[in-house]
Amino acid sequence: MSDSSFRSMRMTRLVRPPGIPGIRKWAESNGHRVGRSGMIPPRVRQAYFAANPEVVEVVRVFAQDSGVGPDVYDWPDDGPLGPVYAIAFVRGLDEQEVLHRLGAEGQDIRLISDAEVAGHQGADGPEEIITIARLGNWVVAECKGRRGSRLEHVKALSIGGGEAVAVQRDRGAHDRFIYAVDGQVVTSFTPSRPFDRRGSDPDRLNGHLRLLGIDPTGDDIVDNAVPAALALASRISGVVIIDFGGNELPPHFADRFSGAKILNRESPRLGAVLGQ
């Protein structure tokens, strides 16, 4: 049941299989009187979804405050990490230990350039490439592949009193958000379905979810799911990943994220290339 007190700024759209008409066209064909614009009566919407159960309504969410929102992470598929990637935010470990717990041996660790990352096959090849950077108490590991979000790795990254937040983008069906503390998964969920949370304390991040426009007690399917999950990771860690040129943050970002730690991808960074 949705939290009746929850209100947010958001947009919805319908995801329809080929051949399924839109709601207005269906309504006209089935004797329901609706206008060409304006709101669809609730009874017509209910009838439409009952007749077309394969149609899904998804919600595009927005930050409800001036903090980090999904818009910051609306990256293109052809970005430096490609369509399949994992990003882990880790507190309590140094850079070498993060790479070690992700499976790297001493001889694997070296400096890696942005050009090498961009040219790497990632999840479609036999190896994955990882780069890391430290910002204050947190280390950010960017993996062109899936290693950084595997459950055993996320738990290992948090052992010893630390925290690890991992976000996996993997063509929708295998997207994942995991938050672990001291070796235990506190909460995890598929980013598009944040209502289905698992872990030792699945509701711990509900306050953050509400500020991202997500009702944690509702059943909305999130359209911009991975950007929202990355924004959630940023709110937990205080680290924001932004692609920009030069050494100074653009004024509109500097004003918006005052006090946040900004990761601008620098070349080269410490990293490793590991087998899948």
Q: Model features per residue range: what roles?
A:
Residues 1-2, 52-65:
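Defense-system signaling and execution modules centered on TIR/cGAS-STING-like, death/scaffold domains
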Residues 7-13:
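Extended, low-hydrophobicity segments enriched in charged/polar residues
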Residues 65-111:
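N-terminal "first-domain core" detector
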Residues 182-276:
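Long, compositionally biased intrinsically disordered terminal regions
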Residues 36-55:
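Short, Lys/Arg-enriched alpha-helical microdomains
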Residues 111-156, 160-191:
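Short, intrinsically disordered low-complexity segments
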